[in-house]
Amino acid sequence: QWSLAIHGGAGVIERAELSPERDAAYRAGLQAALDAGSAVLARGGSALDAVQAAVQTMEDNPLFNAGRGAVFTAAGKNELDSAVMNGVDRTAGAVAGLTRTRHPIAAARAVMEQSPHVMLIGEGAESFAASVGLEQVEPSFFFTESRWQALLTALREAGQPLPARPAGAPPEPSTLGKAVPLASLNEAPLNERKFGTVGAVALDSQGRLAAGTSTGGMTAKRWGRVGDVPVIGAGTYASNADGCAVSATGSGEYFIRATVARDICQRTSTGMGVQAAADAEIADVGSIGGDGGVIVMGKDGAVAFSMNTSGMYRGEAGSGRPSRVAIYADEEASR
């Protein structure tokens, strides 16, 4: 028996703001990620491979704030963070501030499996990723017009200077100010200043748990800001001993302070069910001002989704049950 759950970020997602076309595009993106991870698990593959496959699919989809759809820093750059954790032996890997590695989740896994370390950042992380053969791209690979316009809007609102358009970016479209066609992708209504992230948690047929998370961070971030995603125990955690794997999405500073992912696994280790543990932790992080959501996988394959936002892009699949995806908080997505 295997089980998989994914998320594509939590935040202010209202039906009135999401056109039928965009709704369908997000659901298709979630389904594609579920299909990628499920294919690994259905053929007896590992939870780690499934998590990586699902996350990489979302990293390549400009709809999501990870990899190709990453938001921009105040300086007009894309800085990518990711983490992965193996529940069997609690090994973990994380990267922060990547600018050229196509799949940050692959870099995080390489840190875990091919280095003596847990977290690498910036130029060193980039050099390491290249040295182990991970695909490198020009920074402009991550450019999307909608994220760029979101940055300019945020900087104007804050009264901050606007950076030059990045080298290698396509020329500014003449259609600006008009409705952007779906083909040009993301003018997402999600409040990406806090909530854009992708993640996956899995249980494989051998009972192994794993978790992985990837993000572009928050729009207009400054000073090398890093959120909860690559912080093991905050945005990402997995432990077979605790019977739990977690990937979070939300206001990263609060999720770090509340050690959200580790706390959920601490709760399940005492016998609490995954849904109760997730709900209790979201209530706790909410009590200090944090917004967002989590996906949790139990050792029996039970899936929990919990959020204190109006939506979270999410989905789940498992052996012997149909896959399903959901967007809004009031939609049923778990069993």
Regions picked out by a protein language model, each given a short descriptive name:
Residues 1-335:
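Alpha/propeptide regions of enzymes that mature by internal proteolysis
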